[in-house]
Each structure stands twice: as C-alpha cells, then as structure tokens.
C-alpha cells in the first residue's frame, strides 16, 4: 500500500523526496488519528484521497515558493545506462507532457493509467461522478496524444 501511495504522490509532484515526505506525513496523520481505520468503507480510497490532497497542496506551495514558475524537471526513478538512455528520455518527456495537462485531467489519468485504479475507485478518491471520470480520462488521453504528436519524434500519430 505504501508503494502505491508513493507512486501517486510522485506522479503528482514529480520529486521523490517530496513524495516520500507526503506519504510519511499521511502515515503519521493516520497513526495519530483517533478514529479507527475500519470505520471507512474503502481504506485505500481514503488514503489515496489524503495523498492526493496533500500532493496538490505541495504543488501549490512549491509554485508559490518559486514565484509562480511551473516545475518541468522530472526526477527519474529508474537507472539510465547508455543502452536505455533514449527510453529514459522518452519517459521523462511523457511525464512532462502529463504534467502540462490541467490538474483535474492529470490527476485522474495518473490514477487510471499509471496506478491502475478502476473508474469507480477514481470516482471515490476524487469525489467526482463516475461519468465525469470516464469523460475526463478520455479527454486527458486525447489531449496527451495531441501534445505528443506535436513533437512527432516520439512515434505517436493521430488518425
């Protein structure tokens, strides 16, 4: 579970240290909480919601601290030896493109395509209507495809 929480935080904030801090803060908060976790219908959705909210808060804080400048650097969590350099660069490029999506689209796309949550789980985590989640993911994928096709050297073609 902690790994999933880290992945969501990392995908949203883009910095491994920030993601670790967020997950640690959430774990401490839950530990100190007076209410037992078994009172929640879906503990995983509850924890993901906490991570999501804390990650979005961290993004806002970082943006304000930098004077509104958007962060585009992506920390790669995988080694990049010479033979995988192109793959790593491509991966970083896709992450930058995902980060350029509107917040609501980026968030649900990450939860669906990178973390693997169902539409229903995403609706519970975000508090969105199920149909809105489905439409949002469709639009996010379409926007991402359009962004990637502008570069054209990453092999994504639109029909």
Q: Where do the protein language model's features map onto the residues?
A:
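Residues within helix-turn-helix
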Residues: 17, 120, 131
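DNA-recognition helix of helix-turn-helix
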Residues: 126-151
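Acidic, proline/glycine-rich intrinsically disordered inter-domain spacer in sigma factors
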Residues: 73-99
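The N-cap/first-turn positions of alpha helices
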Residues: 2, 104-105
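Amphipathic, Lys/Arg- and hydrophobic-enriched alpha-helical face
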Residues: 1-16, 33, 98, 150
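Arg/Lys-rich amphipathic alpha helix in sigma70-family domain 2
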Residues: 35-38, 49-69, 87
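A short pre-motif secondary-structure segment
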Residues: 108-112
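Structural recognition of an alpha-helix C-terminal capping motif at a helix-to-coil junction
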Residues: 7, 21-28, 32, 41-53
């Amino acid at each position: 579970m902690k790994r999933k929480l880290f992945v969501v935080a990392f995908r949203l904030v883009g910095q491994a240290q920030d993601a670790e801090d967020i997950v640690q803060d959430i774990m401490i908060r839950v530990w100190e909480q007076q209410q037992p976790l078994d009172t929640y219908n879906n503990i995983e959705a509850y924890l993901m919601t906490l991570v999501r909210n804390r990650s979005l808060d961290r993004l806002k804080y970082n943006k304000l601290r930098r004077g509104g400048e958007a962060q585009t650097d992506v920390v790669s969590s995988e080694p990049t030896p010479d033979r995988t350099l192109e793959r790593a660069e491509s991966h970083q490029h896709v992450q930058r493109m995902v980060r350029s999506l509107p917040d609501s689209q980026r968030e649900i796309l990450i939860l669906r395509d990178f973390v693997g949550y169902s539409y229903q789980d995403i609706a519970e985590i975000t508090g969105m209507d199920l149909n809105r989640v489905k439409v949002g993911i469709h639009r996010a994928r379409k926007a991402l495809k359009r962004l990637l096709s502008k570069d054209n050297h990453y092999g994504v073609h639109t029909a």
